[in-house]
Amino acid sequence: MDYPFKTVPYAHQITALKKSWSQENYAYFMEMGTGKSKVLIDNMSMLYDKGKINGALIIAPKGVYRNWERQEIPIHLPNHIEDFTVAWTPTPNKIQKEMLESIIKDPKDLTLDIFLMNVEALHTTKGARFAERFLNGHRALLVIDESTTIKNPKAIRTKNALKLSTLAKYRRILTGSPVTKDPIDLFSQCEFLDPAILGHSSYYSFKNRYTIQVKTNVGTHIFNKVVGYKNLDELSGLLEPHSYRVLKTDCLDLPEKVYTKRQVDLTDEQKKAYTEMKAYALTMFDNGEVLTASTVMTQLLRLHQISCGHLIMESGETKIFKNNRITELMDILEEAVGEGGTQFISGKVIIWANYRQDIRTIYDTIKTKYGSEAVATYYGDTPDSERQDIVLKFQDPESPLRFFVGNQQTAGYGITLTAASTVVYYSNNYDLEKRIQSEDRAHRIGQKNTVTYIDLIAEKTVDERIVKALRNKINIASTVMGEEFKQWLT
C-alpha cells in the first residue's frame, strides 16, 4: 500500500486499511493487542489527505481516551500532517477553555483537528452539546473506541452517540469483542454506523430475528426470556462487508510482547488522602531527617496503596477508598475474554496485584460477575495443597477457570501460565526482577500468541513513576533516594 506511514504497518493492518479506508462506515473488530488504534489513525490520515475530512472526534472510555493524546497519535500520525489535538475536560482551566473554544470556532483545512472525549461525557448535556458543536463545524470522522460502551440502546450515552452519528459523514467503531454477552450487543453499534447495515430500524425486530425467546413468569411479571440464538450466519453475512475481524492468532508478524496502559483517575477521596500523605513525606525530606531505604520505600508504599484504593494504617487496620481501578479492570476483562461472555469465552487473563486487599477486591468483583469457577487467587494466603491444581485448571482449555489473580512475589516464579495471552498489572511491585519474572509466566515455551501487557496507572502519582521505571528496567528499591525521592513526590 503506497502511503507515507509514520510507523510500518503489519500485514493484517494493511488488509484492514485496504478494506476500509474510503468507506463511510466501518467496524474494526480487532482483538486487543493487534493495533486497531494505529489502523484508525492511518485511516483518518488518508481521509484527511484526500480532503474528505478536516476533523475527527474520537470517543473512548475514561481510562483510554487520553492515551490517544499522549501515546497513539504522537506515535502513529504521519509526520506530514499538522494536527491540533484537544482532550475534553468538563471543568477546564483558562488555557484548556481557550483550546476547546479554538477547536470549535476556528477549523482550518491545513490542520487536522482531533477532539478526544471520554464516552461518559455523552451522559451529560454539556458533553453531548460540545461534541455536536465540533461535528457541526467540521467535515468529520466520528469514532467510538471500545464500542461495546454503546451496546445498551436504552442508555443516555448510546442515544446521544446515535444522534451525533448523523452529523458525521465518516464513522468508525473499534472493539476487540463486539459481542460481550449475546449478538444483540451488535444492534446499537451497527446502528451508529448505519441503520441500513442490519436492515432493522427497531431493536425489538432485530431481537426477534436473531434470538429464541420463551415467555417467562416471575411473580406477576411476564416477559420474554432469551434462551438461544438463530440466523447467526445471516447476521455474520450482513456484517462482513462493513467490518474487519482479526485475532492475535491470525497475525503471524506481530511482536512477541505488546505493552499498553490504561489511565485511572483518582476519586476525590483518594486525592485528599494522597495530597495529605505526600505533604507529610515532603516535610520529612525538608526537615533534614535521615532517609533510609526503608523509610523511602515505606512512604512510596503508602502513596501507592492510596492510588490503588486502600491504605494500611499504622494500627494495622485497612482503610478502603472509593476508586475507579476495579471498574477499569472489569472493562478490560469484558473485552479480553472475547465473544459470548461466560458462555463462549475465548481468552484467559492473568491479573497481577501487589497487595492482599487488591487481590480480595479483584476476586470478589470477578466472582460476582462471572461466577466462582471462573476465578482463582494465587498468593500468600493460598494453601500449598491448592496451588498446583489452580495452575493445571488455568492451563486446561476446557476448564471454566478464566482469571488467574496472583501476587508477583508468590506466583511470579516457576509456574507456567501460557493459557493466557493477556496480562493485566492491577498494581505493580517495585522489584524489577519480580516484574520480569511475572511477565515470563505467560511469555515462555508453549505460548503461541503475542502477549499483551496492560498497566493500570493513576496519573500524576507514584503509580505512574513506578510503571515508567519498570519499563525502563530500573530497580526502584535500589535507586530512589535523596533528591530522586523528592522528584517522585512532586
Residue ranges of model-derived segments:
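Conserved helicase ATPase motor motifs in RecA-like P-loop NTPase domains
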Residues: 32-33, 168-183, 191
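Inter-lobe coupling linker of SF2 helicases/translocases
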Residues: 101, 116-121, 129-136, 155-169, ...
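A conserved SF2-helicase RecA2
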Residues: 430-490
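SF2 helicase motor core recognition
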Residues: 123-125, 181-183, 359-363, 388, ...
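Conserved Walker A/P-loop ATP-binding site and its immediately adjacent core
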Residues: 39, 52-75, 180-185, 354-356
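Conserved pre-motif I regulatory segment
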Residues: 1-29
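Conserved helix-turn-beta segment of the N-terminal RecA-like "Helicase ATP-binding" lobe
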Residues: 64-93, 193-196, 369-372
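Conserved Helicase C-terminal RecA-like lobe
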Residues: 1, 34-35, 39-52, 61, ...
